Amino acid sequence: MNEMLSVRQKRVSEPSKRRLVLLAEFLSRTNKARITSVELASFVHWSSALIRHDIASIGFCGGVSNGYDVRRLCDAILRFFEIAPASSEKKCCIVGLGRLGTALLDEAIFDGTGYKIVAGFDPNVNRTEILRSAFPLYPASRIEAVVASERIEYAILASKNEDAAPLASCLVTCGIRGIVNYTDAVLGSTVSARVENASPVTLLRTLSARVSGIAPEAEEVKRNATFDAC
């Protein structure tokens, strides 16, 4: 990664990063050619001031009275965070081929996203031989060799909870840049900076904690106040 770009990325807060990625996702799907921060606010439910702040944090100055150029803004966000555009693909793998991992074997899920699954791994050798997939499936013992030969950058971890930590450590050691963790396991500090936790149970608990005690009619006010404070 370009060192100067990395320093600039670190100056953007984590909440802003998350919002900007979601914003780019929305922009990539809209049919509008231009859009104002007020219009964006009506779609994503953040304040227009917060949206302008986030956009300014990546150095994008393309906003005028009639709004932002949608394509330029979307491209600027993707470029700033080195997110793969749909026209190019970053290679990924699935680690853990149980029920959840098997559901992800449908590569159509990732069509047009800029990410491509090129390999699957599981500690159970029999499972890799029985399952059918559009991409090769390997025993977990082959992770190091395949990640290197295929130049895989990202991994989706869907293994058993007890296998998650050693598999995550192995992936990072092999050069994986980031892991989407679908397990309930809490991964160690050596890999935590490269992990996005996506366990449905963890997300539901986090959501429950966030909305606990918030009346439905006050939820929108509370959410905007929280984002404005970030």
Which role fits each region the language model picked out?
Residues 85-127:
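Glycine-rich adenosine-cofactor-binding loop
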Residues 34, 38, 43, 47-92:
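HTH-adjacent hinge/linker in prokaryotic transcriptional regulators
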Residues 1-35:
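Extreme N-terminal segment that seeds HTH/winged-HTH DNA-binding domains in transcriptional regulators
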Residues 3-6, 82-89, 217-221:
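Intrinsically disordered, low-complexity coil segments
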Residues 23-32, 130, 134-230:
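Phosphate-bearing ligand-interacting subdomains
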Residues 21, 25-28, 38, 42, ...:
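Solvent-exposed alpha-helical segments within well-ordered globular domains of core cellular machineries
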Residues 44, 98, 184-187:
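Glycine-rich beta-alpha junction loops
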